[in-house]
Amino acid sequence: MSQRKGDEFLLSPSLIEVSVIGHATENLKKIKKAVLNIVPEEEKATLAFTIEKLEGHHGNPIFMIKTTLKNLSGNFLEFLFKALPPEDKLKLLNELNAHIDNECNFYVRLDKQAAFMGETRIKQEDPIRLRMKFKNLKRSILIKKLQEMLKK
């Protein structure tokens, strides 16, 4: 979804799905705090978490913690990209094509431990997973707009 803010094109996902796996040894409250730390203040009040109990590869108990952000009031992408360190922004910029599917979903994985500490970092292992859905936008336009935002 895109909007205009004055003369500026505002790129905003129509939906953001956040999911993270919690292990039996982890504190669920801390995992929720990590998720809250990557969300703009104005979106936190609307978050509702679902927790699903699952079984890991070795029979160990794990939890899938999920939340969905809809009707975003602010610019989540701007918030996210400003929080990323320069080296992570560059890495994401260089790999952007691999993070966007043909349905204009933009996927990002963030470091769960860093998020708990109030930092935003890209990380593939044991991450907080974000799936940002964009409607009524061509993939090529989405890539171009994300590139522009990441270069700021």
Go through each PLM region and give its residues.
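Short amphipathic alpha-helices in soluble, non-transmembrane regions
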Residues: I31-A34, E78-P85, L146-Q147
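A common structural junction motif
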Residues: I38-E43, L84-D88, D126-R129, L150-K152
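Beta-strand elements of well-folded, non-transmembrane domains
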Residues: V20-A24, V39, L69-S73, K112-F116, ...
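Long, charge-patterned amphipathic alpha-helical coiled-coil/hairpin "stalk" segments used as oligomerization
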Residues: E78-K123
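Short, charge-patterned binding micro-sites
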Residues: A45-L72
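Glycine-rich, aromatic-bearing surface loops/beta-hairpins
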Residues: F106-K152
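Long, hydrophobic N-terminal alpha-helical segment
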Residues: M1-T46
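Short, conserved charged micro-motifs
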Residues: E26-K30, S73-F79, M117, S140-I143
